[in-house]
Amino acid sequence: MIAEALAAQKEGWRYTPAAALTGPDFKPAGVPESILPLGGRVLCPVGFHRAALVNGRWEAKHAVLKLPDGVTVEPFSSASGLGDLPNKPAPADMPLAQAASAARDGFVVRVARHARADRPIHLVHISEASSAAESSAARVIVVLEPGATAELVEETLSFGDAPSWKNVRAQVVLGEGAFLRHHRIVREGAQGRLTLGLEVTLASRARYESHALNFGGLFAREDLRVRIEGEGAECALNGLALLGGSEFADHHSVVEHVAVGGTTRQLYKAVIDDKARFVFDGLISVRPGAQKTDAQVYNKNLLLSEDARVNTNPEFKILADDVSCKHGGAVGQMSLEALFYLQSRGIGADEARRLLVYAFGSEMVDRVALEPLKLALADALHGRMPEENF
């Protein structure tokens, strides 16, 4: 069924190796024999509110939720008032999100009108693979009512030597004047696969700030849909992928401006080494009547080997005449002039290369305003620097 659905998406999956998902004989993930503590496993083990899914199931042992009034985090399987939550079917061109819609568990986050989450909310997705290939699905629903504010950190992890696949459908709804800062951190293992379908809707003057950071995994694909429905809404989409070996990452995004005066700023960077591959497809659609739209989409890529590959396609579809829209894509190798400059200052060749790679990636880490997370991401960035003689 999955193979047929992906085969029908010829254009959107043209550069994506679907065999990573259809090749293994995935079985539904079971309950692990033991639940290991999160300490030392998550990237940022600080005093955030926290909830976790293990193999697609809410794990009460990992929940640390002393939430203020007006803020709730519940398991999808037993959340109250599900009938009031978003229930639109997933878009037709997101077949994996359609499949994940049938998931039995996940996270439901709600922030009431003018309420504020006092600390970031950390949602952890963990795959504990057994000796066989296993898959899990999950739902994530985040609703901020008018004037609400929250910071969300989602982290995906996989452990074990067997193939694992997490398939997640997420829906974010921001009411008038609401603000969500949404961090998504991918730290999959050598056999970890992640597919995410994320739909975001913004009402008037709502603000959505996204940071998507990929620190590795065999396969990751994110399909992001943002719909700016209210006047004056703002959307900032930041991303960084650090890939090596035979890793693959694919970022597909569509931002649809429907209302007057919306703003989008998108910048996604990737560092690709060895035989890794990266795909970026970023479309901004400006609908009729969405005058005064101010939108930009850029993708910048740094190749560290002759075998690394990038496919990039930032684009616009504009059906309004009073707009400001800019886009660009770049693929390049390390600057020989910059290398020569650093070496002329007494820095060794390998260290000079690592400094340049770090400088390229650190721009996206520096955009993270949450200080404990920024420090943890900087350490993770150091850990993903190329080895000597690259």
Regions found by a protein language model. Give the residues of each.
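Long, low-complexity, mixed-charge
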Residues: 1-87
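Conserved beta-strand/loop scaffold segments within soluble protein domains that form the structured core
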Residues: 50, 60-61, 66-72, 78-347, ...
